[in-house]
A protein has these predicted regions:
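Membrane transport/envelope proteins' first extracytoplasmic loop
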Residues: 1-174
Length: 174
């Protein structure tokens, strides 16, 4: 696609975690090789299936420490994960979350309380449900400016322009 320097597929899903009286929504994301590199402030970045790096703010607020086991549950008939519990091997940060706001969801209260990163093989999906795109020349434009927003919006329209064609291709493939 014209204007794309690099792209990488990823997986992500929202899950519930915690005790019944204090369930919170956690966004789980697959660890990327090239995009949005996470940092472990404590412990390590997951190296094996069943390991998780937790959001430092979420870990602090919920009392999680390296070595703890965190249990998660998916919504209804959603089966995107191979596991329902993970060992916390790291606590850290992600460039995707630079403010206190972790996003919105259709689960629980509608607010995501934190994020966690797991290995791609812990997702039980054949097809990516997210994509990260490095837009040509985006690094030369200051983030959050009108020029940056215009550049990204143009790329978003190009990607959306091929969506139906790609969905039909995938449908025929299956």
């Amino acid at each position: 696609l014209d204007g794309v320097e690099e792209a990488e597929g990823a997986w992500g899903t929202d899950v519930m975690c915690g005790s019944d009286d204090a369930l919170k929504v956690l966004h789980l994301e697959s660890i990327s090789e090239e995009f949005n590199r996470i940092t472990a402030d404590e412990g390590i970045i997951p190296e094996k299936s069943g390991q998780i790096l937790l959001d430092s703010l979420f870990a602090k607020n919920r009392g999680y420490k390296v070595g703890d086991i965190i249990s998660v549950s998916e919504d209804g008939d959603q089966n995107l994960l191979k596991k329902t519990s993970y060992e916390v091997v790291g606590i850290g940060s992600s460039p995707l979350y630079i403010s206190f706001n972790r996003g919105n969801t259709t689960l629980g209260s509608g607010e995501i309380s934190g994020f966690g990163y797991i290995l791609p093989e812990d997702f039980d999906q054949e097809v990516y449900n997210q994509i990260y795109i490095h837009v040509h020349s985006a690094e030369k434009v200051i983030s959050y400016t009108d020029a940056y927003e215009t550049l990204i919006e143009k790329m978003q329209k190009r990607v959306e322009g091929i969506e139906k064609e790609q969905c039909a291709f995938r449908y025929d493939e299956v």
